Regions:
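Hydrophobic ligand-binding cavity/cleft-lining segments
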Residues: 1-60
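Short beta-strand or tight-loop elements
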Residues: 75-77, 89, 101-105
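Short, hydrophobic/aromatic-rich segments at coil-to-beta transitions
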Residues: 85-93
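Hydrophobic pocket/interface hotspot
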Residues: 26-30, 81, 116, 149
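A residue-level detector for short acidic-glycine micro-motifs
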Residues: 83-85, 111
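Intrinsic-disorder/low-complexity, polar/charged segments enriched in Ser/Thr/Lys/Arg/Asp/Glu/Gln
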Residues: 10-18, 90, 104, 113-115
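Secreted/surface-exposed cysteine- and glycine-rich disulfide frameworks
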Residues: 58-76
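Beta-strand/loop substructures that line and gate deep hydrophobic ligand-binding cavities in soluble
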Residues: 94-139
Length: 151
């Protein structure tokens, strides 16, 4: 288990939308994310990021996921399921790619609200610089993914 005390703070971005009457259809999209389905937007960009990761000695873009309901510990491309609860419509994935920090993406439906949350804990100055350099691209990609899931 890695000691997260060596990391400084958490940077968070949250998207939120009203999905009244569509909670189940939105959850079905969340449950199916990754693998053959892709990421609803920018899958080629995710594959490119995976190629860069492989060059840096990481795992690369491991396309795939189980063909059943997700469980804790399952692989979803280069993410790992670290929290899933179908009854709460909750899914949390942790990135396994090479990064100057730790990153998670959480999808959750509470009542009639759908949330997509990105959490990044940078490691050192390079982690903070990395976050701010990629933030515009990540913001665009994650916004488009969010819109596609809500649609």
């Amino acid at each position: 288990v890695e000691n997260l005390n060596s990391y400084e703070y958490t940077l968070i971005e949250i998207w939120e939308a009203d999905v009244s009457g569509r909670e189940d259809s939105v959850w079905k999209k969340i449950e199916a994310i990754g693998g053959e389905q892709g990421w609803y937007y920018g899958t080629i960009l995710w594959k490119t990021r995976g190629a860069v990761d492989k060059l840096l000695g990481g795992i690369g873009y491991r396309k795939g996921r189980p063909f059943r309901e997700l469980r804790n510990g399952d692989q979803v491309d280069f993410w790992r399921v670290v929290g899933v609860d179908k009854s709460r419509k909750y899914l949390k994935l942790q990135a396994e790619m090479k990064l100057p920090g730790k990153v998670w993406i959480t999808y959750e439906i509470k009542a009639n609200r759908f949330f997509q949350k990105i959490e990044f804990i940078p490691k050192g100055a390079f982690g903070r610089v990395y976050w701010y350099l990629v933030k515009p691209l990540h913001y665009f990609i994650f916004t488009q993914m969010f819109r596609a899931i809500v649609k």
